[in-house]
UniProtKB/Swiss-Prot annotation:
Binding residues annotated for substrate, in chain numbering: K163, S192, R249
Species in which this protein is naturally found: Shigella boydii serotype 18 (strain CDC 3083-94 / BS512)
This protein's name: Homoserine O-succinyltransferase
HAMAP family: MetA_acyltransf
InterPro entries: Class_I_gatase-like (IPR029062), HST_MetA (IPR005697), MetA_family (IPR033752)
Length: 309
């Protein structure tokens, strides 16, 4: 799916170098079709890097996807130029009267922070409440899953003693589920989190359908039966080097991190890691766009009436 972004967004040239189909706004205006409107709430510190990762996964289908980037933290960023944020991001007040086909809420490095201590926790709750009436389907990633489970279902924050970092095997529980259509029975995906997601806890607190689990019984992929919300507890959007960058950052900070599991060849950080989850990540986002967004969203977004027909 060609993603539709502003002509000057840095991701345009970055993704074109990878032969990813990126359609600038000026070119898209000549096509008489309605693009899917997808809002990305980017909570990661390195916003440009995160943009590249998610836009890459949203680019593999014949329809246009019109991307809008959202920020809710007004504090000065230490990792992203203010000019970039001012040029390419909107504030919630700018879009709160609009409707969107899809919303993606990214992860955030807040696994050890209590929810009420998160600087923008009230804004997170505001966006999630707003999305019930203004978004067809929302996809939560990693920390955003934990936040959404607390806000929407009252599930207390579950924190691991040690950080889960590495590339783990998962297995699908419902081979004919739309979100896992085309998945291998077992597949790999990266994790980088302190949050804990026991499958039994999800089943006890919610009516969400768990579609894939880790070998240890953690929920990886789950969704509501009406397709309005979906959750992925890992980071299928990560580049091959992202876990390495996080590991060496923590080493330099003197944190003595564990070597990411099943990631570096021969478990040696001096070896170059390879992405073993790329096909899974692409298929997951393609399925979400197709079955959870495109097939149930109304043609006229002025009238939000998602349907499963």
């Amino acid at each position: 799916m060609p993603i539709r972004v502003p002509d000057e967004l840095p991701a345009v040239n970055f993704l074109r170098e990878e032969n990813v189909f990126v359609m600038t706004t000026s070119r898209a205006s000549g096509q008489e079709i309605r693009p899917l409107k997808v809002l990305i709430l980017n909570l990661m510190p390195k916003k440009i890097e995160t943009e590249n990762q998610f836009l890459r996964l949203l680019s593999n289908s014949p329809l246009q996807v019109d991307i809008q980037l959202l920020r809710i933290d007004s504090r000065e960023s230490r990792n992203t130029p203010a000019e970039h944020l001012n040029n390419f991001y909107c504030n919630f007040e700018d879009i709160q009267e609009q409707n969107f086909d899809g919303l993606i809420v990214t992860g955030a490095p807040l696994g050890l922070v209590e929810f009420n201590d998160v600087a923008y926790w009230p804004q997170i709750k505001q966006v999630l409440e707003w999305s019930k009436d203004h978004v067809t389907s929302t996809l939560f990633v990693c920390w955003a899953v934990q936040a959404a489970l607390n806000i929407l279902y009252g599930i207390p924050k579950q924190t691991r003693t040690d950080k889960l970092s590495g590339v783990y095997e998962h297995h699908i529980l419902h081979p004919h589920a739309l979100l896992t259509r085309g998945f291998d029975d077992s597949f790999l995906a990266p994790h980088s989190r302190y949050a804990d997601f026991p499958a039994a806890l999800i089943r006890d607190y919610t009516d969400l359908e768990i579609l894939a689990e880790t070998e240890e019984g953690d929920a990886y992929l789950f969704a509501s039966k009406d397709k309005r919300i979906a959750f992925v507890t890992g980071h299928p959007e990560y580049d091959a080097q992202t876990l390495a960058q996080e590991y060496f950052r923590d080493v330099e900070a003197g944190l003595d991190p564990e070597v990411p599991y099943n990631y570096f060849p021969h478990n040696d950080p001096q070896n170059t890691p390879r992405a073993s989850w790329r096909s899974h990540g692409n298929l997951l986002f393609t399925n979400w766009l197709n079955y959870y967004v495109y097939q149930i969203t109304p043609y006229d977004l002025r009238h939000m009436n998602p349907t499963l027909d």
